[in-house]
Structure formats: C-alpha cells, structure tokens
Amino acid sequence: LAILKAKSPSCGSGVIYDGTHTHTLAEGDGVFARLLRREGVCVVSEDMVESCKPSVEHPVAIVLGTGLGHLAALVKPVRRIDYHDIEGFPRDARPVRGHSFEATIGTIDGVPVVVYPGRIHLYQGYSAEEVTALVRHAHRLGCRDIFFACATGAVPGNAHVGLGILTDQVNLTGQNPLAGSNLRDVETPFVGMTDAYTPYLRTLARGVADDLGITVEEGVFAGVMGPCFETPAEVAMLRGMDVSYTGFSTALEVILAHALGMNVLGMTLASNESGDPKMSHQSVLEAAERHADDFERLVRGVLRLL
C-alpha cells in the first residue's frame, strides 16, 4: 500500500508498507506512482485516505472478551450507553466476571471508537440474534471497521498460549444469526464467508506487532457453544481440522459483521492450552492481566494506522 500526497504534481511523498511491514516516507513522482501500480501496489491519494479514516460518523467498533475490558479505560469518553438500552440486547442479562455492560463512545489516541467491554454468550441461554445485538448496534452507529477480541484456548500442536490474530473460523455452535425470518439490516442470508476476517486488517495487525516487538501467532478459530471446556477427543478433532484457537464467542458476531459489509479484525488471547485440566475462568482472567500491556499496544498501533 502506498499513500501519496494528492496535491504534489509528482504524487509527492507518502507512506509505503513494504514486505517487512515497516513504514517509511519515500519521495515519489508520477513515474514512481505508475511503477508502483505496475508492481501491483495499491496507490491512493491523501484525500482518499482522509475520507476513509475513522471519524465521528464512522468510528471503529471494538468488542472485548473475558478479562480484556481494561481497554475501555483508554477511551476519552464522550458518551456512555448501558447495554440494556441497546435494541435487541436482553434486559435480564447480567455480566459474567471479566465483562462489563456499558459501551463507551469516544476516542483512543484521537481515533473515534465505540468500545463494548463485554458480551453475552449462547451458553447463558441467549439466542444467536441476542448475542449479536452489539454488532447491529455498531453498524447502525456507522462503524465500518470492527475489532473482536476474545479469550480462547490454544489447540496443542497448532498454537501456543499468548496473543493471536484470527485468519478464518469454523462455526461449531450449531447456531447462525442469519438463520430464521428476522434479517434486519441484511440483504440476504446467503453470504459467502471467504475473507470474513478482512485480509488487510490482518496484515496491518501483523505489521504493527512486528514493529512493536509483540509476539503474535495467526490461526483459525473454532467457535463452540460452551460452557464446558474441551474433552481430549474434541481437542484431537480440532487439531486434525487445523484449528488453532477455540472459544465460546466471536464466531456468530463475525458472521453478522461480514454479512453487514463491515471490515473485521479478530484478535485473541489464548490463555491456556485446550484440554488443560487446570483450566478455569479465574485462570483466563489472570492470563488476560499478564498480557494486558501487549494487547493494548497492539490495538492502539492498529488504530493509529487506520
């Protein structure tokens, strides 16, 4: 990607993201711009970049999972919204430990955001439509980009404990937010799921991690119903399916966000190995605390480049 100054007669200087994902200013001209295009590099004007940046009209939505709600403290708030005032969100819902039910609209490092520091889950008895209510809300607020962060188990042999970027998913919940007769805001339920996790956002996140020295892995996510953790047989099945991470959320949210035309970035904190007999909700919270700084740096780094 090359971002070139639109007002320069020679297409000026801009930011070029090379194969190492580092960014440097480079002088260019009309010939340079044509050369970049010939090499398959996307060249866009500064004006176009400004029109696509997050704005008050198009904030970035961030949905946070178990133990990751601390990111909400980074927001310079303009407005707060109780989840129970969001259309479609169940009024009787109460947050589990590590979640909060108050969205914050504001900015992080000057970037307009809407942060949702908690979720509800299928295993609590809620429907696919209810667990995706936050996605519909973000879409109606004008969000074009949405980040999903979740706590997961790392499938032994395919991933390690730590931060990860989701590349694809397998929906094993038996539920789908596009099934049924209530298809508000969605043109058709027959949605192709190729690149449900937007490729350029994945590349951007990987580049930010490399630049900041943050260790991240990449892999496929499997969404399961929960609340039980995986049996050894289930872990073996997931390993054979080339699944790297498994968790109780995210899969349905990604389906709806993709169907709504939103750009999706999936990030995970693998707090344990799937099938670990010592696994508990408390251990997830403790792992989230250990990785809090790196997670915050990664999110802030991606936001700065949008």
Predicted segments — roles?
Residues S274-L306:
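His/Asp/Glu-rich mid-to-C-terminal helical/loop segments that flank catalytic regions of hydrolases
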Residues R144, S244, N263:
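Short acidic/polar active-site loop segments enriched in Thr and Asp
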Residues E50-M193:
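Metabolite-binding pocket within alpha/beta catalytic cores that recognizes anionic/polar moieties
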Residues A138-G142, R239, H258:
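Non-catalytic positions within long, well-ordered alpha-helices that form the structural scaffold/packing
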Residues V186-Y197, V235, A287-R300:
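Polyanion-binding loop/helix "lid" in catalytic or ligand-binding cores
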Residues S10-C11, V15-E39, V44, F101-V111, ...:
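Mid-sequence, gly/pro-rich, charge-dense loop/helix-turn segments that line enzyme active sites
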Residues F248-S283:
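Zn-dependent metallopeptidase/amidohydrolase metal-coordination segment
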